[in-house]
């Protein structure tokens, strides 16, 4: 698949275009231009390194939304075996913007749950652009309860702009479904490992992200609102999204510094979409390390650790009036 370049990557796109032209010429010519191709390839690689070393929060947001970025089911195919998808919330419907099911990770049975976007127009519409309705969160709760019953560790993958704000979703109890998931995940008697793989949008993300370990891919985001939404509220214009992204502190490095996540997983040069298999290999190691951390830990110790982790969120300082 031909790589889609973002606006800020146009210098790289131009170089890659020249490289492709030279490769096409070389295939139909007796002239050896391999050295020139190699020179331009090294130049493109260095340019990518330089560009990605100084990304703004808004540019990171664009990478997190890249249309070729691996989604949950892509990682399921690379990281897990014997995946058997489970459907429905047993109350209303099956929301396919959240996928989940039984699988094996390194031979160990587990439960996998994650947001799922679409690749083309038809699939994006079917999966509601990765924005779950209440039945999606209730399906996730059902699968988490099932995992707890059989003592299976839970892996969740976050990639959503946010919970769907439509009238039907609100009528069916969107906020209740999200709130219940927060409560349930805080009390579950089994390990939960969460990875933000793309967008982590507000409560829609948090509803499957109350975990014992929360990791983020290097160029993913996690925030209470999208930059465009924040800009529309504060500045009455979505054009201020770059400034909003800066103010939100939505990047992995900023959130790690604040103690809101536990680990950052580096991405291949140019982002996960440039090397999905390489990204999957890095993610596999991180998930295995996290799972080993909780193996052998008692249920009481696990829940106590989770509670302490949640209670450590946020810092404040008390002052005496007039001091």
UniProtKB/Swiss-Prot annotation:
Keyword Transferase: yes
Keywords: ATP-binding, Cytoplasm, Fatty acid biosynthesis, Fatty acid metabolism, Lipid biosynthesis, Lipid metabolism, Nucleotide-binding, Transferase
EC number: 2.1.3.15
A GO BP entry: fatty acid biosynthetic process
Gene Ontology molecular function: acetyl-CoA carboxylase activity; ATP binding; carboxyl- or carbamoyltransferase activity
Pathway terms, separated by semicolons: Lipid metabolism; malonyl-CoA biosynthesis; malonyl-CoA from acetyl-CoA: step 1/1
One GO cellular component term: acetyl-CoA carboxylase complex
Domain CoA carboxyltransferase C-terminal as annotated: residue spans: 39-293
Catalysis performed (reactions): N(6)-carboxybiotinyl-L-lysyl-[protein] + acetyl-CoA = N(6)-biotinyl-L-lysyl-[protein] + malonyl-CoA
Top enzyme category: transferase
Subcellular location: Cytoplasm
Signal peptide residue numbers: none
One Pfam family it belongs to: ACCA
Nucleotide-binding listed as a keyword: yes
Domain of life: Bacteria
Entries under NCBIfam families matching the protein: accA, AccA_sub, PRK05724.1
Assembly mode: Acetyl-CoA carboxylase is a heterohexamer composed of biotin carboxyl carrier protein (AccB), biotin carboxylase (AccC) and two subunits each of ACCase subunit alpha (AccA) and ACCase subunit beta (AccD).
Free-text function comment from the UniProt entry: Component of the acetyl coenzyme A carboxylase (ACC) complex. First, biotin carboxylase catalyzes the carboxylation of biotin on its carrier protein (BCCP) and then the CO(2) group is transferred by the carboxyltransferase to acetyl-CoA to form malonyl-CoA.
Family of the protein in this entry: Belongs to the AccA family.
Protein name: Acetyl-coenzyme A carboxylase carboxyl transferase subunit alpha
Lineage of origin: Bacteria, Pseudomonadati, Pseudomonadota, Betaproteobacteria, Burkholderiales
